[in-house]
Amino acid sequence: MPQARWHGPQRRIGVTGGIASGKSSVGLYLSEQHALPLLDADIYARDALVAGSAATMAVLQRYGNAVAEAGQLNPISIDRIALASIIFSDAQERRWLEQLIHPIVAKRFDVALADLSAEPVVVLMIPLLFEAKLSGLCSDVWLVDCSPAQQCQRLIARDGLTLKQAEQRISTQWPLEQKRPLADLVIDNSGAPRAWRDQISSIC
């Protein structure tokens, strides 16, 4: 059953999609061209794993030197590439990390939204909006859509992954076809950028 939405006076646009579907481009466009406050789940997730944080200590306790940044003593930083190699290849470990990080991210959103309560519209950029059950933070959900082949191409070009690695990372998220019926607006990012900009501008 779909999660209930936010029904307060503030309009909260949740921007989601698949990996490399173009969420960041849409979120930044809304922020820069329409002067809307932008809250980014990826930034909150990265902040959760800074050196010395409780989440970082939990990760280091679980994986030890396998994810410890070489050459650092105290506080120890996490080698994010090493951690990614673990969680993208093991569903159980990925679920463990998500259960650790998602509540931290949700709390950061709560604090930020309270600070922005006077703003009429806020944009929330949340890649795992449905997976993390965060759609209840949003009054509107916009899904940035493209084909799986385009996701692969963009991941390979952006992150230097192999085709197998790109497909593996895409498979860790809900497929876009599963997310489309849950969205209020599907933004087609399979063609020229100008197309989705026109689509957004017509409703903002």
UniProtKB/Swiss-Prot annotation:
Catalytic activity: 3'-dephospho-CoA + ATP = ADP + CoA + H(+)
Keywords annotated in UniProt: ATP-binding, Coenzyme A biosynthesis, Cytoplasm, Kinase, Nucleotide-binding, Transferase
Molecular functions per Gene Ontology: ATP binding; dephospho-CoA kinase activity
Top class in the EC scheme: transferase
Any one cellular-component term (Gene Ontology): cytoplasm
EC number(s) recorded for this UniProt protein: 2.7.1.24
Record domain DPCK: where: 12-204
GO process terms (BP): coenzyme A biosynthetic process
Keyword ATP-binding on entry: yes
Coiled-coil zones: none
Pathway: Cofactor biosynthesis; coenzyme A biosynthesis; CoA from (R)-pantothenate: step 5/5
Subcellular location: Cytoplasm
Kinase among keywords: yes
Binding residues for ATP: A20, S21, G22, K23, S24, S25
Function, as annotated: Catalyzes the phosphorylation of the 3'-hydroxyl group of dephosphocoenzyme A to form coenzyme A.
The family this protein is said to belong to: Belongs to the CoaE family.
Name this protein carries in UniProt: Dephospho-CoA kinase
Gene it is expressed from: coaE
